[in-house]
Amino acid sequence: MARYDGSGWVGKYGNEKMRNQSKYGAKAAVGPEQTGLRIDAFGLKLIVIAAMTVDHIGTLIYPEALWLRLVGRLAMPIVAFLLVEGYHHTRHLGRYLLRLLVFAVLAQPVYRLVFPHGLNVFFDLLVGLCLLWAVQRIRSRWLTAALVLAVGVAGFYVTLDWWHLGVFMVFVFHVTRGRFGWTVAALSGLLLANAGLFAVVSARTGEPGYQLINFINLGCLLALPLLARYNGRRGRDCRALFYVFYPVHLLLLYALLKVLAGAGS
């Protein structure tokens, strides 16, 4: 009989074998066996940087160009996936948590300079990593579900960058790790349920923005073909790149926005 062990279902239909093979350089943690182009973790980080930049250009400079926001949806599922991989591979979870906390605090003044409210994405990742630590130690699926739901609701009310959705993505990648078909199904279900929920909220509040952005979030599914190509390897060790790039690119875009606003006045 299968059982829940905090990281997923193990047993007859579980992923115990895959988890034991998931060292860097071993079989890919998500994608099925494929030939052709494969992508390491460094390559995925570069895609995140590009998608995030496009997304923020759309948010700040060309808000009417919704296709820019759609391209930007690639970023969060890849970041959530890499966080889960980092959690399973790190030898120093405390250092990982501390690094996220430090950069979350350092990036927040820049984030609030650019955006009027909310918390930056490093807080999403910090909360997600803490959640992984907690659920790994819970043996009850019901307590796990209650904890994940509570953290997601809290993320919505404290206005994490991705509200509840980023935390839920982290959990999805965690419990389906090593089983790509389940990853596709679970992520699709999450995003469709989220879009449906906010369609109802939008209808009841008369605010179309809720429905629009959460239908755009379905574009997160575009990240799945890229994750299917993940080869399980770290690639170049440039872990500081994303941490530094995030606040720097926001500052540069903010400066560009001010220049454009000044030129148009």
Residue ranges of model-derived segments:
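Alpha-helical transmembrane segments and their immediate juxtamembrane cytosolic regions
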Residues: 2-265
